[in-house]
């Protein structure tokens, strides 16, 4: 976060700060410096925006010390494995932790945490890779939760049944559905 060079609270070490009532108690008159301060702020922000846009366009999400990682989500500056941002770099978390779905690169896994590939210069961390996720099998949907279950079609109207059908007494139907259409 960039800080202003002037103290807007009104006093900087008891001297040289801004005063809301002009030059009093060794403070600087606001009116004389507002224009300079505004120009400084606009110039600084414009420069940052240009650099980040250039980094985004030329380097993708990161790289060049000024991409999505470095300025957009965590500030410019070095990280353990390169210029960092967003938990050590967008490339570091997703490229390393998840094997690179955003860039196709392969990261080095270190106890679940990934280093990002060089093109993104991602830092350490960012995304956590759960080793057990690949081993887990997806549960098959239970037939009784299927709105098109042929044994309980009336319970799930009007999703895939004739809306004029009466509620069924099938035990496989959801209770909520039976209750909703009970008085139909």
UniProtKB/Swiss-Prot annotation:
One of its GO terms (cellular component) is virion component. Keywords: Virion. Its main location: virion. It is found in: Virion. It comes from Acanthamoeba polyphaga mimivirus. This is Uncharacterized protein L647. Residues 130-149 are annotated as: Disordered.
């Amino acid at each position: 976060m960039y800080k202003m060079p002037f103290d807007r609270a009104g006093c900087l070490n008891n001297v040289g700060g801004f005063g809301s009532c002009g030059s009093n108690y060794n403070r600087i008159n606001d009116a004389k410096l507002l224009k300079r301060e505004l120009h400084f702020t606009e110039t600084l922000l414009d420069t940052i925006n240009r650099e980040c846009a250039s980094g985004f366009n030329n380097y993708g999400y990161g790289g060049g010390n000024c991409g999505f990682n470095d300025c957009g989500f965590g500030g410019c500056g070095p990280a353990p494995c390169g210029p960092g941002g967003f938990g050590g770099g967008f490339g570091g978390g997703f490229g390393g932790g998840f094997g690179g779905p955003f860039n196709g690169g392969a990261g080095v896994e270190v106890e679940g945490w990934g280093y990002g590939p060089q093109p993104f210069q991602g830092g350490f961390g960012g995304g956590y890779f759960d080793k057990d996720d690949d081993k887990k099998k997806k549960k098959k949907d239970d037939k009784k939760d299927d709105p098109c279950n042929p044994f309980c079609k009336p319970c799930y109207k009007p999703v895939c049944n004739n809306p004029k059908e009466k509620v069924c007494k099938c035990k496989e139907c959801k209770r909520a559905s039976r209750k909703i259409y009970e008085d139909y």
